Amino acid sequence: MARKSLIQREKKRQKLEQKYHSIRRSSKKEISKVPSLSDKWEIYGKLQSLPRNSAPTRLHRRCFLTGRPRANYRDFGLSGHILREMVHACLLPGATRSSW
Protein backbone atom coordinates (compact mmCIF):
# COMPACT_ATOMS: atom_id res chain seq x y z
CA MET A 1 0.00 0.00 0.00
CA ALA A 2 1.41 3.36 -0.98
CA ARG A 3 1.54 6.14 1.55
CA LYS A 4 -1.53 8.32 1.56
CA SER A 5 0.53 11.46 1.08
CA LEU A 6 1.88 10.14 -2.23
CA ILE A 7 -1.61 9.31 -3.45
CA GLN A 8 -2.86 12.77 -2.47
CA ARG A 9 0.12 14.39 -4.19
CA GLU A 10 -0.75 12.52 -7.38
CA LYS A 11 -4.39 13.67 -7.16
CA LYS A 12 -3.20 17.25 -6.73
CA ARG A 13 -1.07 16.91 -9.87
CA GLN A 14 -4.05 15.58 -11.81
CA LYS A 15 -6.17 18.57 -10.78
CA LEU A 16 -3.41 21.01 -11.74
CA GLU A 17 -2.92 19.29 -15.10
CA GLN A 18 -6.63 19.56 -15.88
CA LYS A 19 -6.71 23.20 -14.77
CA TYR A 20 -3.81 24.33 -16.99
CA HIS A 21 -4.31 21.91 -19.90
CA SER A 22 -6.08 24.38 -22.17
CA ILE A 23 -3.57 27.17 -21.45
CA ARG A 24 -0.63 24.87 -22.15
CA ARG A 25 -2.19 23.52 -25.35
CA SER A 26 -3.06 26.97 -26.73
CA SER A 27 0.43 28.30 -25.94
CA LYS A 28 2.05 25.42 -27.81
CA LYS A 29 -0.17 26.00 -30.83
CA GLU A 30 0.66 29.70 -30.72
CA ILE A 31 4.40 28.94 -30.74
CA SER A 32 4.09 27.03 -34.01
CA LYS A 33 2.12 29.87 -35.65
CA VAL A 34 4.29 32.83 -34.60
CA PRO A 35 7.16 33.49 -37.05
CA SER A 36 9.33 35.87 -34.99
CA LEU A 37 11.78 34.52 -32.47
CA SER A 38 11.20 37.26 -29.89
CA ASP A 39 7.48 36.45 -29.73
CA LYS A 40 8.28 32.77 -29.34
CA TRP A 41 10.52 33.56 -26.36
CA GLU A 42 7.68 35.47 -24.71
CA ILE A 43 5.37 32.49 -25.12
CA TYR A 44 8.07 30.17 -23.76
CA GLY A 45 8.25 32.45 -20.72
CA LYS A 46 4.50 32.06 -20.20
CA LEU A 47 4.85 28.29 -20.39
CA GLN A 48 7.69 28.32 -17.88
CA SER A 49 5.66 30.44 -15.48
CA LEU A 50 3.03 27.68 -15.21
CA PRO A 51 3.39 25.36 -12.19
CA ARG A 52 5.71 22.41 -12.71
CA ASN A 53 3.15 19.93 -11.46
CA SER A 54 0.73 21.04 -14.17
CA ALA A 55 2.83 19.30 -16.84
CA PRO A 56 1.31 16.00 -18.01
CA THR A 57 4.70 14.25 -17.92
CA ARG A 58 4.75 14.48 -14.12
CA LEU A 59 1.69 12.26 -13.77
CA HIS A 60 1.98 8.57 -12.88
CA ARG A 61 -0.58 5.87 -13.40
CA ARG A 62 -1.36 4.26 -10.04
CA CYS A 63 -3.25 1.15 -8.95
CA PHE A 64 -6.62 2.34 -7.68
CA LEU A 65 -6.69 -0.28 -4.89
CA THR A 66 -3.16 -0.07 -3.50
CA GLY A 67 -1.72 3.10 -5.04
CA ARG A 68 1.28 1.21 -6.40
CA PRO A 69 2.96 3.29 -9.15
CA ARG A 70 4.64 0.46 -11.05
CA ALA A 71 3.49 -2.48 -13.18
CA ASN A 72 0.03 -1.09 -13.90
CA TYR A 73 -2.30 -2.50 -16.52
CA ARG A 74 -4.20 0.26 -18.30
CA ASP A 75 -7.18 -1.93 -19.14
CA PHE A 76 -7.93 -2.68 -15.50
CA GLY A 77 -6.27 0.16 -13.57
CA LEU A 78 -4.63 -2.39 -11.30
CA SER A 79 -1.06 -3.33 -10.49
CA GLY A 80 0.25 -6.69 -11.61
CA HIS A 81 0.06 -8.59 -8.35
CA ILE A 82 -3.44 -7.32 -7.49
CA LEU A 83 -4.59 -8.19 -11.01
CA ARG A 84 -3.20 -11.71 -10.59
CA GLU A 85 -4.94 -12.19 -7.24
CA MET A 86 -8.26 -10.96 -8.63
CA VAL A 87 -8.04 -13.21 -11.69
CA HIS A 88 -7.28 -16.23 -9.48
CA ALA A 89 -10.31 -15.37 -7.34
CA CYS A 90 -12.48 -14.96 -10.50
CA LEU A 91 -13.28 -11.34 -9.61
CA LEU A 92 -12.53 -9.96 -13.08
CA PRO A 93 -15.05 -11.01 -15.73
CA GLY A 94 -13.52 -12.06 -19.02
CA ALA A 95 -9.99 -12.46 -17.66
CA THR A 96 -8.67 -16.01 -17.69
CA ARG A 97 -5.43 -17.56 -16.62
CA SER A 98 -3.34 -18.78 -19.47
CA SER A 99 -2.74 -22.51 -19.77
CA TRP A 100 -0.95 -24.36 -22.54
Curated annotation (Swiss-Prot):
Highest taxon above the source species: Eukaryota
GO biological process: translation
Alphabetical UniProt keywords: Chloroplast, Plastid, Ribonucleoprotein, Ribosomal protein, RNA-binding, rRNA-binding
Pfam families attached to this UniProt entry: Ribosomal_S14
Molecular function as annotated in GO: rRNA binding; structural constituent of ribosome
Gene Ontology cellular-component annotations: chloroplast; small ribosomal subunit
Classification via InterPro entries: Ribosomal_uS14, Ribosomal_uS14_bac/plastid, Ribosomal_uS14_CS
Subcellular locations according to the entry: Plastid, Chloroplast
Disordered as annotated region, ranges: 1-31
UniProt family annotation: Belongs to the universal ribosomal protein uS14 family.
Subunit structure as annotated in this protein's UniProt entry: Part of the 30S ribosomal subunit.
Protein name from the UniProt record: Small ribosomal subunit protein uS14c
This protein's encoding gene: rps14
